[in-house]
Amino acid sequence: MKGFLLVALPVLFLSLSTQVFGEPSIPSAAQIVQNANRLLAEGSYSAAARAYGEAIELDPTGYANYYKRATAYLSMGRHNAALDDFEQILRINPGFVQAHYQRAKILAKEGDFAKAQYELKAYVRTKSDSEAEELSHLLTVGEAAEKSALQAFEKGKWQVCVEHSTKALEVGPNSEKLRRLRVNCATELGDINMVYGDLSRLASLDPSTTYLPLQLSNIAYFIRASSQAAAHIKQCLHFDPDSKPCKAVHKTIRSLEKDAARVRNFIESGTYRQAIKILDGDDGLLVRFEKALDDATKPKDGLPPYLAPQFHPKKNSQMRLDLYALACKASVMANDFGEKGAHWCEETMSMNEENVDSWISRGERLLRVEKWEEAMRAVEKAFELSGRSQDILPRVQKAQRLLKQSKQKDYYKVLGVPRDADERAIKKAFRKAAKLAHPDVGGSEEKMAALNEAYEVLSNTELRQRYDNGDDPNDPTGGQQHNPFAHHGGGMPFQFFQQGGGFQGFHQGFPGGGQKMHFQWN
């Protein structure tokens, strides 16, 4: 008996709970529609569309629910789904002509002007209003513009094609056909911004493609130097996580951008040589960037290149300009005006003639080859482009002094050495010239004095630096007036004085009489 009670108790409880609580209630169609209406009003279009779908399952003949679901679909941009719902409405209730008008509007935006005209005619058979007349006019304009755009494309009239396809797209902005037509014509014109905008719209209209996001990421990174490149690659990988082309582009851009960020950080911190180290070399940032840019201009797997040749990628690449400008700045700030720095700065100037660092580099290099007036113009250009920066003013003043100096004494020319000659070369040149300048061998005291004056300046590190900066230590009108012969920090290889006697110190004497210069090796 006790066992029977233990078994019976759960059964009794279940029976009581069913009587008390009842079966789980199932919402009625009216309740579902009421909830869907609330969601639609709140802007929760996806949830509203699902709710209307549930109501339609309960009552497939209620065309009002199709209409409201179509409204939700339109708000979500699901135009094809909305078209299907409006078509279903007409099957249920052919007299509901408003569905024809809605289909006409959708088809017009899709660029299907002929079908839109058909739907609009079905609407105006029973009802005509100003909105329908306006739509009819727009469809006529759109059809004519599309026809003209196609004709212009066939004749290679790219600008005309762009103008007419633009007019047609004003009526049918969601038309992939018209959008691609304008892309083709704008590409021929090299209009990168228009192409980028249209490709972005096409990618949103067809998110299942991988080529468009790849093309967009390459344009965004190489041409526009935009952070949007990463977003486009994510779209590509979102659709196909295993896509090899998407992974390859992602890896390349990530590697380049990582090193570019390091270069920017080094330049900002003043460690210019470290920045140059990353930029330079066969595996340096600039070489890898140029290779990646070149790859983007080549067709792949039977598809067009990501960057059309009409874009002139090397000339118009903002990222290329940014990287070469960084390289130019690093070389200028490191006072590196050799061939490498010159190449970087000249490339920068070829893309942007208003880059300040490239003009500084050109000016400094012109100074080194003694083209004083050209150098003066270059550094003055940099000064003006910089907004008369006080950081550049010393370079202008230096060029001015050197230009003035060039019209006076040139100690390097006196010794016959280049401006970058080292101490040993200067001493050797002086000794050689002194043998020829001595009065006993056809020279003169004036020539010998000029040699001594030149050597005194160029053999002294401090005096030479002043002279190289345009301040002649022997010029009484210079910035620092003093007698450069008051000290011999650089060391004269000869000490001379007026006396009779031979020309000593060389392995062989020079015959002759009269006043002699006596030289003694240091």
UniProtKB/Swiss-Prot annotation:
CDD domains, per this entry?
DnaJ (cd06257)
Write out the ranges of the repeats annotated as TPR. 29-62, 63-96, 97-130, 142-175, 210-243, 256-289, 356-389
Give residue ranges for domain J.
410-471
Keywords, A to Z, come to:
Chaperone, Endoplasmic reticulum, Repeat, Signal, TPR repeat, Virulence
* Induction of synthesis: Protein amounts are increased by ER stress elicited by tunicamycin.
Q: Where is the signal peptide?
A: 1-22
Q: Where in the cell is it found?
A: Endoplasmic reticulum lumen
Q: Name one Pfam family in it.
A: TPR_1
Q: What happens when the gene is disrupted?
A: Leads to hypersensitivity to endoplasmic reticulum (ER) stress caused by the N-glycosylation inhibitor tunicamycin. Markedly impairs the elaboration of virulence factors such as the polysaccharide capsule and extracellular urease activity, when induced at 37 degrees Celsius corresponsing to the human body temperature. Also impairs induction of the cytokines IL-6, IL-10, and MCP-1 in the lungs of mice and attenuates virulence in an intranasal murine model of cryptococcosis.
GO cellular component terms, alphabetically, are: endoplasmic reticulum lumen
Tell me a Gene Ontology molecular-function term this record carries: protein-folding chaperone binding
The alphabetized list of GO BP terms reads: protein folding in endoplasmic reticulum
Q: Which residues lie within the region annotated Disordered?
A: 465-494
Read off the domain note.
The TPR repeats mediate interaction with unfolded polypeptides and the J-domain is essential to stimulate the ATPase activity of the chaperone and to increase its substrate affinity during the folding cycle.
Q: What does this protein do?
A: Endoplasmic reticulum co-chaperone crucial for survival and virulence factor production at elevated temperatures representative of febrile patients during infection. Contributes to virulence in a mouse model of cryptococcosis. With chaperone CNE1, coordinately maintains ER homeostasis and contributes to maintenance of cell wall architecture.
Q: What is this protein called?
A: Tetratricopeptide repeat and J domain-containing co-chaperone DNJ1
Phylogenetic classification of the source organism? Eukaryota, Fungi, Dikarya, Basidiomycota, Agaricomycotina
- This chain is encoded by the gene named DNJ1
